Amino acid sequence: MTLKDKVALVTGGSRGIGRSVCVRLAGAGAFVFINYARNEEAARETLRLVGQAGGNGKVVRFDVADDRATAEAIAALIREKGRIDILVNNAGESRDGLLVRMKEQDWGRVLDTNLTGAFHCCRAAAYAMMKQRGGRIINVSSLVALSGNAGQANYSASKAGLIGLTKSLARELAPRAICVNAVAPGLIDTDMTSAMTEEQREKILEGIPLSRLGTPDDVAGVVLFLASDEAGYITGQVIGVNGGLYM
């Protein structure tokens, strides 16, 4: 699969799944804008890995929850490169807690970043893609969007909303040859899971038919495919990457 001469924006590209997506897209030939909101050092490390993979990219800072900042940043990168071909909405955060103890700001911030942030990016990029008569939007949802999870009402709702956004935009943008899909990772071995005890890890592995945690690169491989010309007849789909944990 080649993405030669394509321009991509990956939100939340400073670590985890986002970092792997940046490296895979750049390695396939795309110029990758690596978005981050807070950790510039981590974003610079992603850029270093992009270069190590033989790719090219640039670090861009903006908070996807900020509509104006997002619109201005995406307009600037489109002016710089003349186009945007691939948008990967990966930026996200979690503020877990039981419903009766969840604060309003914890609910709101997760929805603002995970769902409204993706809306901001889609809206800012869609017009350019429509003018180009082509593009790829890939939203990073989650297994819990489909299964739910105790203590994650805000996170689950935000990721379920992403699936609704994906399907609606797939219908709306299809006449301009823009494919919109989602990936729904299961339990992925990132810094978010590194705090688990060995006992917790073993218990979880018992429920995964493939008997291992996923890796960021497992998810990035699917994103790469969906961003490619080979996926030109796929839109409105949710691809699970969960080792069989949820079928």
Language-model segments: which ranges?
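Alpha-helical segment proximal to the catalytic Tyr-Lys
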Residues: 127, 171-175, 232
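The beta1-alpha1 cofactor-binding region of Rossmann-like NAD(H)/NADP(H)-dependent oxidoreductases
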Residues: 40, 61-72, 104, 217-218
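Conserved glycine-rich cofactor-binding loop
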Residues: 7, 14-15
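Residue(s) in the substrate-gating loop at a strand-loop-helix junction
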Residues: 142
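Active-site helix of classical SDR
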Residues: 122, 158, 166
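C-terminal substrate-recognition "lid" of short-chain dehydrogenase/reductases
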Residues: 2, 119, 134, 178, ...
